[in-house]
Amino acid sequence: MTRAFVGIQIPDQITALLQPVQDRLPMGRIVPPENLHLTLCFLGDVGDPALEAVHEGLSGLHPSAVDVTLSGLDWIGGAYPRAIVAGVVPNSGLSALHRAVLGACRAAGVTVERRRFVPHVTLARLGKARASAALNDVVLRHKLTPFGAFRAMGCTLYQSDLRPDGAVYTPLASYPLRSEGR
């Protein structure tokens, strides 16, 4: 079984804007710059035949490139936050890409969670730690901070290996997104 997800890699110019904010977080396990991504679909643990079917399905998609704008810090996890995230401004192109990727994964026989798509980039994981006043202060200070924008020209199928010191993401395949007019 392979733990996998489909996501958009965050480019270096955006991670450079996020790192100073990550450095100010007083607690939590910081996500390293090379792991920063926007998840389009979490597959969970899937067997090789399903993973190959997902790859084939994603290879057949030809959605348009999408604009991604990161803005503001927030929590995810409800009353007991489990992560600090940079928000991603929703847009129709990103929603269409999300739906296309979900459709390809479901057509491959993978059961994916049915939850509302809230695009974000995880900056730190809190685990079982309770949020501190200092952490709350950092999040509130950056609630509306713009972190830049980029045009996503592709998405990637990743393998996720969980390790004691954090997850390691390995790209398995990349799928180009169509530029306008192609």
Please provide the spans of the model-predicted regions.
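Histidine-dependent nucleotide/RNA phosphoesterase domain, centered on the 2H-phosphoesterase fold
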Residues: M1-R182
